Amino acid sequence: MPPSRDELDERFTREGLDPRWWGNAPGDTYGWHSHHYHKVLFCQRGSITFHTMSGDVQLRPGDRLDIEPGTQHAATVGASGVTCVEASRG
């Protein structure tokens, strides 16, 4: 069973992070971009595939992805949509 919203909020809080929840519909996409901060992201429901210059990473419920500052990435939401929680570090 995937972690609940409360469990994921607690994980972020323990790391000193401020969680922000978001979701997208099936097939939604994010174009190539980067951030000036370290992004910490958990998938809570559905799936999303992050595309990087090093290859693709698919996240499913309970999976975590850390994206270092300056890393170029794009994303495609899976067939069931997605709900994620993320925060920035630094």
Regions found by a protein language model. Give the residues of each.
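Ligand-binding loop in jelly-roll beta-barrel domains
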Residues: 70-90
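Short, charged/polar surface micro-motifs in flexible loops or helix N-caps
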Residues: 26-27, 45-48, 90
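Conserved short histidine dyad/triad with adjacent acidic residue
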Residues: 18-35, 69
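A generic "binding-loop/recognition-motif" signal
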Residues: 26, 36-37, 55, 71-72, ...
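Short acidic-glycine-tyrosine-enriched beta hairpin
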Residues: 53-69
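Short histidine-centered beta-strand/loop micro-motifs
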Residues: 9-11, 29-35, 51, 76-77
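Short, conserved beta-strand element in jelly-roll/cupin
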Residues: 34-49
